[in-house]
Structure formats: C-alpha cells, structure tokens
C-alpha cells in the first residue's frame, strides 16, 4: 500500500494516479477503438451537406421554347409547386427540352422527396402532350455538381452510333447500378436510328405528302400482342413479321400505288442508318467521342463510388471490341485524395512541431514523452467517436484535428508543468502528482468547457454553412474532451511514474543555456509588468484602442464566402451569336479546342454541342478542361483560366466563360461564372424591358467582371401565319399544318424498332440539302378535302421574327440569371454591395424582384449571421465561466483578452491579401477559445493565492503572471505551431486551409504580447470595482 502525504487528495485524478495498470489499460482501449474506427471512416473532400435535389428532364424533339414552356414545363411546375418541403424550383425550357430542378429543405429525406416528385409527375401526365416520345425522367442529382468521373469512349474503326449503342447497353447500365451513382449521362447523342429523309419534290410529283409517308411507316412497323392458340393437346404462340429492323427493309416499304404501280419509300426518300439526333456531338481532345459523365447521388460517398467504378472498368472494357478505347479523362477523387494526404501530412508536422516546443521548454525527455503520448492518444481516440457519428475523413475534420494538436497538448503541459514545479521543490513524485493534479484539476475543467462553449454556436448555424461546419466543431470538441480526460488521468499517472528530482535536475549545456534564457525572459517580463501595473490607465487605453481597431479592421477587410479551390478541373461555356447553327458551333468548338490543348497546363479536354437537357441552347457549347496535377504545372487554376481566355479572345464572335470546379456546390444550375444574381418578373415583356438596363449597369461596375445573362431573345424564328379561312375552305386544319411542319423539320420520332437488348427509333424529316433555310418551307405540301395536295404557301405567309432561345422560370415566374466574377482587387462583399446599390439607383418597380443565388445567397446569409455567431460564442463562454467561477466579474476579465486576438487575425489576413471568409471566421472563433486560456491560468492562481496565502490582489496577480508565464508561453506556441502548417500549406486544397492558419497565427502572435500585460491590469480594475460594489451594498456578502 502506498503511503500518501496528508492533504494530497489529487482531486479527480487520485484514482488514476494510484492505479497505473487500470489507467494504462483504459487508455489502450481508447487507442484501440480509435485505430479500428479510423479504418471504417470514409474519405471525402468536405462533409456531406447537399441539399436534396431532383432534376426532371422531358425531351420533345422539334418543339419551340414557347411550346415546351406552355405544354410541358408549366403543367409539371403546377404539380411540383404543391409539394411540401420544396425550397426552390427552377426550370429551363429550350428547343426540344424541358429541365425542372427541384431543391428541397435540408431536413427532408431524399427518398421522401423522390416519392413526392413521382406522384406529381403522375398527376401531370394527362396534361402533357400525347405524342411525347418518352415521359418525364427524374434523377436524384444536382445538375450544377461537376461529375465525379468523366470517361471518353472513342473508336477509329467504328461509327459513333455503334459505339454509343455498346456503351449504353454494356457500360452505362452497369455503372448506373453502382451504389452512390445518381446519374450516368452520355454526351454525344449518337443513338442509332433509321433516318428517313424525304425528297420534297419527289413526293409532290407523286401527289403525296409527308403525312402519307408517316402513316405508312407507322402502320408497317408494329410490335404488339397477337395472342395464342390453345388446343386439346398443344398450345401455340402467335407471331408475325410485323417488325422491320433494317434500313434496307424500310427502303422496300410500299407507301402508295400510282396507276397500279407500287411506290416504295426508297423512291421518295433517302433511308439510312444514322443518329437519332443529328444536332448533337461530343469530342474528347478533338476526336469524336461518346463522353460518359458520372454524377453521384446527394450524400453518397464519392471515394467509395469512384473506387467501385474503377474496379469494374477492366471487366466492362473487355466486353467491347478492341478498336473501342475507354479513357478516364477526369476523376475528382484524385484531387480529393491528394488534398487529404496533404492535410494528413500537415497534421503529422503539427504534432512534431508541438512535441519539439515541449522539449524546448521542459528540456527533459521523460517530461516530453508524457505530452507526446497524450497528443496522438487524444487525436486517435477521436476517430472512434467520428465513426459513431457517421463523420468522414475530410479536409474540415482533418483541419479540426490539426488545430486540436495545439489545443490538446495545452492540458498536458499545464499538468506536467505544475507537477514538475512541486518535484523541483523536493516533493516525492507521487505526492507531487497528487498535489499538482489536484491543484490544477479545476483549471483543466475550466479550460475545457470554456473552449467547448466557443464551439457551441457553430452547431446551431443554420442552412448549408451550419451543416458544413458541424463535423468540424464536433470533431474538435471531442478531441478537446478526450484531451481533458487524458490530462486528468494518464498524464499525472505518467508523471508519478516517470518524473523524479534527478531526471528534472539532470541538465546538459543546452538545457542550462535555455534555462538562463527563460530566466532572463521572465525577469524582463516581471520588470515590464511592474511598470504596467504602476500605469494602469495607459494599459487600459491600449486595450480600448485595440477594441476600436478590431472594429475598424472588421469594417474595412474584404469579405468573401468560401475560398476558391484549385481542383484541377475547369468548367466552361462557349457562347456564340444566337442564330448559330449546329454546324457553325461544331466548327467554332474545334477552333477553341485547338488553342486550349496547346496550353502546357492542360491535360485533356471534352467539348459538347447541341441541346440535350444539360446544354440549353444550340448556340452554346460545354467544355470540361482537365489540368495536369498541381505538382506537374507551374500555374494555379486562375492563372491558367486567364491564359486560356486570352488565347481564345482572338476567335471572332465567340465568348468563352471559364470557372474552376469546387468541392462545395450550392447552385442548382450550371452557370457561366462563379456567382449568380436573378431578375424576376410576372411577364416576359416586363423582363425584356429591364434585363438590358440592368445588364448594362452591371457591366459598368468595376467590382464585377465577365457579366453575362442567360436572356436570349434574338434567336431567329420562322413564323407561319396561317390564313385560317383559306385553310378551312380547302379542308385543311391547323393540326394538319403542324403535323406537316413537324414531319419535315422536327426530326420526328415516328416509330420504334424493338430488339432483345435495346429500342431504336425511326426518324422522319425532309432532306433540306437542296433547299436550305426558309426556302424549304415552300416545299411543304398538305392534303386538301378533295384528295389533292396544296402548297403551304397557298394558305400561309412566312415571316422571319426574333424569338427567345430559352425561357427560364424561378418558382413558376419568368426569370433571368446574371452571372459574374469578381476581378482581382475586389471581394465578393464589394460586388454584392455594388449590385445592391445599382438596384436602388435603377428604382425597379414593385413587380420586378431580384435575388442572389447559390454561393452569393449563402454569402449574404453567412455575412448577416457572422457577428451574431461571434457574439453567441462570447456569451456562451461568459455563461460557462460564470458558472465555473460563481462570479459575474471574473468572466469579464477573461473575455477582455478577445479583442487582441481579433486585431491580430484581421491584420494577418489583410497583410496576406486574404479575404475574411467563412474559414477565417472559424479561425477567429477558435481564437476566442485559445486566447482566454492565458487569462484563466493567471486568474486561477491569483484567486488561489488570495484565498490560501492571504496575498493582496496586486501581489497575487503579479505572482500568478510570473508563475504561469512559462506554461502560457508554451501553450500559446504549441497552438501557434499547430496552426503554422495550415498557414504555410501549398499543396492540393491549400486554399481551403490557409485562411484558418493565417487567422490563428496572426491572432496568437498579437494576443500573446498584449494579454500578458492587459489581463492583470483589468483584473485589478474589476477587483476594485467589486470592492466598491460591496462597500455600497454591504448586505451582499458574496461577490455580485
């Protein structure tokens, strides 16, 4: 049995000090749980914070934007608008395509949203056009999310129609079945089909019309049930040659008889194997390709999903002919893994730096080993809790652990330093551990809970930003709690077992030199502190000036939302004149692609032209530029973008918009630039009046660059003005006119060919090669009442007009989206304020509304809540400290250190040229928790000296400052060095980590210098104030 000195209670640490084996096994259990938990943690770029988003796509080839809006989009919107939990509904109706994007509240499960969407589509079915080729198709993806993986399928021996058929049936379906895949899209549009190109002159000479041909084809190709025969002994299934499956069969089809002679389809049309839509095309590095974009489901594990796809690719490619090549052009997980690896390295570097600082101060290997064990144990133990909470290894949780390195060592340092002090005075190690741990136990508890209190407001942040930082805050809080447990259990036990007077007194030349240096520093600090205490009002003036300076810096510093990351992938939009055709766009993308691929930083490029639901209009093309790895190129992504735009600028009549892809996607539609602002009206006419005015005003603002809008109302349209009286007299209905036009120019899908593996379409159109443009309309013939044919020009007048290329809605009303970037030298906050000022200047009417979208809207919300977030952190800490100290006064003394941290952080951000964004604000909030530690350590010892030794407040705080100077300096440097790797990071994802490191290092440097002098002065000021209150209200025996 161990003999304990009287009074050596040890507080909460007593049991663990006296039972070292049990303590060791308990810590081993924490370590083992953390190691096992780490193996089960998924890897991601950021915490999963996706809004539940569903996209509904309806294709109606040949329909104008106006027809798509009124007959497809509007009926769907009316049903979708009745769904509960819907946050925002946007739609885009263009030629032949309607896309409705539904964004739901964060609290609504995606499966519930899916059920509501399916029910709404079913309810709208009867209102949709009866001749839709396919019903509306929904997918659980955010269209603005960049694909997690892009694959290109090429062949130098096979036509693209055959390649797409194989990819669709053998590859895309298998990838779609992978867990986590939300949607696999094939860009390139080369689905096989039988194309029937009518010769207008030939059918007119025979007295036929396109409707006659269409009816003949649809009647000749069917695939329906025919029944069976059931006899006394045998059953027979009925079958027939009702399907035609080759172009040759269609050529031989008899469509009419003239003077008893058959007229075959091949006589009046060119029938060939081709693509279902001839106005779609994709290229990979300028070679024709089928491009597969794989998007994940919201909430899916991106790393696990990509790994599953890569594992099955070899098996899938083996099923394809050797001439077909499948190439992975981009894989977002490559950069995610690199970013996580860099952050893990910075975490290990932070641990090494912290241990180095410990050794520099303690100059004793056993004393250094103790916190050297406490730090990794606290961090590894956190993994076990992260698994339980369904967290992931991502940039934010790793940043939390890196910052925690400086936090968790603080507790161990404070305990070791206090126990070592008693051992050096001659106490036995066991007695010193019990006495030192018992004395410091309340301080550890105060430090822990006051620091966790700072993180509490982060847990209550609303919307997507709150979800984003919940994992960060909880991970850090768990690490701090485990650190407190380790510091009150393992650390004093190890001190009792490993420290001794001999080990602490054993010094070499380096130790003695460091000791002399520290003694001189403490002596200099003592002299300076004495002078400061003799001139308190000057010190208070400095503290007040610091507060004012922090407010001023907060006002002037540029403000942003989220750091722009370099993920190695650039999304682009190529814009051409609104009347551009598919052929001209294909030629322009080739010119642009040639110049982009010449850039040394570009690794691969995919381009797409055509309208397919993802690309809204024919005069725009989509690009995805994949850059070389960061260590293989000299420039960051923004420099590459500037260089590419300069290279393309000399190509006439095209505009290239580029933006880097981001891990955090808040938008619900693909934009030309990073930020969006919408203008909404009740009618298209009102919108057309105000869009040019606002766009011109925005383009003149220096705070904005690359301003553009999706308002396109100058597309060419041929208006067929039918003379209804003349048409009626001839027995021709408006439906007949529409059918004739659709047959000729709509790439009309008139029949379906069924096979065992897939279904293919028969496409009807006029061969317009000999009569291009509006002249082709003159070849249209219609059947009159007497059976003859009438030219369209006999009953209609053709006019050329301007019409919108697409019609966009936001919550069922017409809307235009303005896209913009922020030029160098300005911040997002500057741009937002400039837009708001412009809006006031224009004096928009009441029926015109504006709203920021996506990340700009989130920035506004975050900016409005930032001040309240910091205030909430301060109030939470005050409440916790007030409860712990049973005092209204001492928490104020501790919190008086906070302005110094704010000044240092803001100055560091300004000097580094960094914006005050969400990451930097989190750093400032963490500083609130770190900086107050200095004051807590001073005040705890001062109060103990007053209470136990009867010292005066001045002598008590003076002695406390000198006694706690070394641990204060040690813990501050540990926290600083824990943040230093983040500040100096240069690898993948460094843009995300650097603002946090800059804010924390700057705040710690300034606050360390100032709080050592301002805290004791403020302590004495409030002590006098407390005495004054007691003298005025003597009935209050206890401190108010």
Swiss-Prot record:
As one GO molecular function, the record gives:
xenobiotic transmembrane transporter activity
Chain ranges passing through the membrane: 25-45, 347-367, 369-389, 396-416, 440-460, 472-492, 537-557, 863-883, 888-908, 910-930, 968-988, 998-1018
Record bears the keyword Oxidoreductase: no
Recite the UniProt keywords alphabetically.
Answer: Cell inner membrane, Cell membrane, Membrane, Transmembrane, Transmembrane helix, Transport
- Compartments where located: Cell inner membrane
Membrane topology according to the record: Multi-pass membrane protein
Alphabetical list of Pfam families matching this protein? ACR_tran (PF00873)
* Gene Ontology cellular component terms for the protein in this record: plasma membrane
- Assign the protein's first listed, main location to one coarse class: membrane
Extract the InterPro entries matched here. AcrB_DN_DC_subdom, Acrflvin-R, Multidrug-R_MdtB
Q: Which family does it belong to?
A: Belongs to the resistance-nodulation-cell division (RND) (TC 2.A.6) family. MdtB subfamily.
Q: How does it assemble?
A: Part of a tripartite efflux system composed of MdtA, MdtB and MdtC. MdtB forms a heteromultimer with MdtC.
Q: Which HAMAP family match?
A: MdtB
Matching NCBIfam families: PRK10503.1, RND_permease_2
Q: What is this protein called?
A: Multidrug resistance protein MdtB
